[in-house]
Amino acid sequence: MIDNKVFCVHGGIPPPWMPGGGFISHLDTLSNDIKNPEDDEPLVWEYLWNDPWFSDFKNSLPPNTKIDDEGFVSNFRRGTGHLFTAKALDKFLNRNRLTHVIRAHEVKQNGFQVQHQNRLLTVFSSSKYCNGSNDSACVLIDNKKLRLLKLDTS
């Protein structure tokens, strides 16, 4: 958490029907020693594995799969967790009185990606990941402004 306004997470946000109802304060009640989060703490699993929804996924949705009223759908790309829409992110941010979510979890060619009305930042700080050609980036927060910095790692 940065300045009580920016939530940093590895993967994404959880659906509100998970334990804690989508309030990040519930994280304080969890153990620091979780051996098997998928089974022992499904909420932690969601924070680790959930991803943002992209509109081009619409053509890839498996048959009889739809986005629920809260803005979540099963993560058919990974086979675990959920995808969350801009609607889901907006509800999560409002519920927790936040302005932004910063996440990692996915390689981005430019090192970063801005989504969901500029309130979700995916930042990947490892350049040339797995011998790839991606750049790396980081976020600077100063005077309540977020700045994405692309890193020169040549």
Task: Pin down the residues of each PLM region.
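Feature recognizes metal-dependent phosphohydrolase scaffolds
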Residues: 1-154
